[in-house]
Every structure is written in C-alpha cells, then in structure tokens.
From Swiss-Prot:
<feature type="binding site">
    <location>
        <begin position="10"/>
        <end position="15"/>
    </location>
    <ligand>
        <name>NADP(+)</name>
    </ligand>
</feature>
<comment type="similarity">
    <text>Belongs to the 3-beta-HSD family.</text>
</comment>
<dbReference type="Pfam" id="PF01073">
    <property type="entry name" value="3Beta_HSD"/>
</dbReference>
<dbReference type="GO" id="GO:0006694">
    <property type="term" value="P:steroid biosynthetic process"/>
</dbReference>
<dbReference type="GO" id="GO:0005789">
    <property type="term" value="C:endoplasmic reticulum membrane"/>
</dbReference>
<protein>
    <recommendedName>
        <fullName>NADPH-dependent 3-keto-steroid reductase HSD3B3</fullName>
        <ecNumber>1.1.1.270</ecNumber>
        <ecNumber>1.1.1.210</ecNumber>
    </recommendedName>
</protein>
<keyword id="KW-0472">Membrane</keyword>
<keyword id="KW-0560">Oxidoreductase</keyword>
<feature type="transmembrane region" description="Helical">
    <location>
        <begin position="288"/>
        <end position="308"/>
    </location>
</feature>
<keyword id="KW-0521">NADP</keyword>
<keyword id="KW-0496">Mitochondrion</keyword>
<dbReference type="InterPro" id="IPR002225">
    <property type="entry name" value="3Beta_OHSteriod_DH/Estase"/>
</dbReference>
<feature type="binding site">
    <location>
        <position position="159"/>
    </location>
    <ligand>
        <name>NADP(+)</name>
    </ligand>
</feature>
<feature type="binding site">
    <location>
        <position position="155"/>
    </location>
    <ligand>
        <name>NADP(+)</name>
    </ligand>
</feature>
<keyword id="KW-0753">Steroid metabolism</keyword>
<dbReference type="InterPro" id="IPR036291">
    <property type="entry name" value="NAD(P)-bd_dom_sf"/>
</dbReference>
<dbReference type="GO" id="GO:0000253">
    <property type="term" value="F:3-beta-hydroxysteroid 3-dehydrogenase (NADP+) activity"/>
</dbReference>
Length: 373
C-alpha cells in the first residue's frame, strides 16, 4: 500500500481515540489528522505521545462548519467519520441530533468531493436496523436481511439517513475526476475502559449500595469491545485502498461485533463488575408491556405540553424497545470482505474492563473517605 493520510472526526470520543492509536501503528501512514469540537489538555497530551510514531495534527472545529471541514480534508487520503450525537434518552434537542448526525455527514461528504478524498468510512449503528418491536426476535441477523428502523426517534432516524447518504455517495466523481468509495460499519453497544455508559451505570450503582438498577433483563444483544470496533475501521481503510479488496467493499455496510457473549445490557454490566462486589437489583420491575404503554403515555403528555413547555420524558417506547429486545447480528460478512477478526478476546476484554471498573470503585471509596473526614 502506498503512503496515505487519514482524517478522523470525533477524534476525542470513546471510539475515535482508539482508532487514532491503532492508525498510529500503520507503517505507511504519513499523517493522522484529528478533528474534535474541543480537546481537553489530557487528550492533547495523549495525542502528543503518538508523534513519535506518525505525524499527528490536532484540529478543533464543528462538524457543522463546512469551511472547517473543507480545510480538514485537504491532502487527505481517507476519512473515518465517527463524530455523532448519541442520544436515546431525549436529552439533546431533536433538531440538534439530526443536524449533527445527518447534516454534518452531508457537509463532510461534500468536503471530501471538493478536496479529492477517495475513501470515506462511516461509523454507523445497529440502531439503523431497529429493533422495531420487542416482540420480534432477530438472532444472528445478516446484511442480506435488510432490517431497517421505522422509528422517528432522532438518533435512529438521523443515523439511518446519514448511512443512506454515505452509501449513495459511493461512486461520486471527485473534483479531480477521481472516484469516491464509501462503506459503513454498523456498530452495536461498545464497551470497554472509559465507556461513559458503563461509567454512569457504575456511578449510579455505587451510590445505590452496589446495586445495578436496570430495565433490560429481557434483552439479548450483540456488543463489541472498543478496540475491536476500532480495528474494524482500520481494516476498512486498508480494504478500500486495496485494488483487489475494494470492489467488494465499495457501497457496502457491515455489522461489526466480536465474541462477547450475547446477553442483556444488565447481565453484561454485572459480568464486568461482579469482581468488585456490585450486583444486580433483584427488586420487582414492571412488565415490559406496561413500561411500553407508560412510555406512550409520557410521549403523549410531552406532545400536549409542547406548545407551552418542553417536557422530556424519562423514557419512551423506543427506549423500552431498545432495552428489551432480542437483537443480535453476525459479523461473517466483515470477516469475508474486510478480513475482520477480533483483536481482543472476550476474556481479555472482560479482564481489562473489569480492572478499569475496579479503579472507579476505588475512586468512589476515596471520595467517601474525603467526605467522612
């Protein structure tokens, strides 16, 4: 493979940081260009350590700033687009989520065409495929089955439309007459050290006498360790630049997971944290059907109040469905086309994540000791 350069959006995020670390190991890579809305001093320090391996350029900017994106794409061979507003709880205004996820992606595709960037890889989500009903079971689904979300929820909707835009852009003519090649990686729940979801879950559990309070005991999901998710992006970048592999990858989407056992969100969090004395809350939980219809009631209240008050319900039907569905996918197509195999085993991923959770437990104990003094 000839020398190449790569722009990673969302570079300060959970996934983006891991992708950058892996890209820095690529021998032919001349530059990693990192784009994020605002890097912390710690982020900058970590990026500076990679300078000994490859050139790392740090850019701060907004994914909705078209001029910023045009500058960021100049002289780049590959764009890996991970920047996104991830929100299934309704905490972020609907239009903001759609703007970041859809309009931002469209701006970036336009920037790639103008800057003659030939490869675009999109970090998509299994949310674009559903689940549409907690009553429908999908086990080891494949790309050929064409599952598609029917929810109007802003996250699922915006990711679905952005993925469609990315795949439709495959074959577009670049400003210099070249061709843009694209693909999308549909990621499930990503876990690992520094996962905000797990960190927040552990924080609530530690404040609740070690009880993990969840509402997803009926779900069965695919999940992926963060390093394995990052590795799939590196392989996609290699593949779309390989004349032999690229024709099979262009315009395709891939489900990405690993060998983490299919289980509920609650069970996964418990498995990762049980060494530190955390345990599931076994108290009574409402039936899923009741939660679903209560979610509908909350949505109705929110709709009726909208002219005078912006009421954000604590949950809705979409969230209830997400947390209580059997919804798993196979990564065989990624194995075939990308040569994807998980870098990190389930056992190693569990151990590393558990050790990190242990550090959170120790921090919590330290905070309690300080408060007691």
């Amino acid at each position: 493979m000839p020398a190449w350069s790569c722009l990673v959006t969302g570079a300060g995020g959970f996934l983006g940081q891991r992708i950058i670390r892996m890209l820095a190991q690529e021998k032919e890579l001349q530059e990693v260009r990192t784009l994020f809305r605002s890097f912390t001093p710690k982020h900058r320090e970590e990026l500076s350590k990679l300078q000994t391996k490859t050139k790392v350029t740090v850019l701060e900017g907004d994914i909705l700033d078209a001029q910023c994106l045009r500058r960021a794409c100049q002289g780049i061979s590959v764009v890996i687009h991970t920047a996104a507003a991830i929100d299934v709880f309704g905490a972020i205004p609907r239009q903001t989520v759609i703007d970041i996820n859809l309009k931002g992606t469209q701006h970036l595709l336009d920037a790639c065409i103008g800057a003659r960037v030939p490869v675009f890889i999109y970090s998509s989500s299994v949310a674009v495929a559903g689940p549409n009903s907690y009553k429908v079971i999908i086990q080891n689904g494949s790309e050929e089955e064409n599952h598609e979300s029917t929810w109007s929820d802003p996250y699922a909707y915006s990711k679905k439309m952005a993925e469609k835009a990315v795949l439709a852009a495959n074959g577009s003519t670049l400003k210099d007459g070249g061709t843009l090649h694209t693909c999308a990686l549909r990621l499930p729940f990503i876990y690992g050290e520094k996962s905000k979801f797990i960190s927040d879950t552990m924080d609530r559990a530690l404040k609740n006498n070690g009880l993990i309070n969840g509402f997803s005991r009926f779900s069965v999901i695919s999940s992926v360790y963060v390093n394995n998710a990052a590795w799939a992006h590196v392989l996609a970048a290699r593949g779309l630049q390989d004349p032999k592999k690229s024709p099979n990858i262009q315009g395709q989407f891939y489900y990405i997971s690993d060998d983490t056992p299919h289980q509920s969100y609650d069970d996964l969090c418990y498995t990762l944290s049980k060494d530190w004395g955390l345990r599931p809350d076994s108290s009574w939980k409402p039936p899923v059907a009741l939660l679903y219809w209560f979610g509908f009631l909350l949505e109705t209240v929110s709709f009726l109040l909208r002219p005078v008050y912006n009421y954000q319900p604590p949950f809705n039907r979409h969230l209830v469905t997400l947390l209580n569905s059997v919804f798993t996918f196979s990564y065989k197509k990624a194995q075939r086309d990308l040569g994807y195999e998980p870098l990190v085993s389930w056992e190693e991923a569990r151990e590393k994540t558990s050790e990190w959770i242990g550090s959170l437990v120790e921090q919590h104990k330290g905070t309690l000791n300080i408060k007691a003094q």
